């Protein structure tokens, strides 16, 4: 059965295989991602993320990373990227 779970965003998160990252967002000052998962899936993988602030340089692109979302945190904006496995 498919279900959407919320995970607190970190540099690395353990997710069920074949899961789909739907959205990133802020709740009460904490960064989260919402992920569509098969709750019967037992195999997992490590999903890795990069969190880049507006105006900060980085050296990756769409070939190695997938853009997820931008999060607004008061005067800061954070851009969330998933590292492709």
Please give the residue ranges for each predicted region:
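Catalytic phosphate/metal-binding cores of nucleic-acid and nucleotide-processing enzymes, i.e., regions
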Residues: 1-85
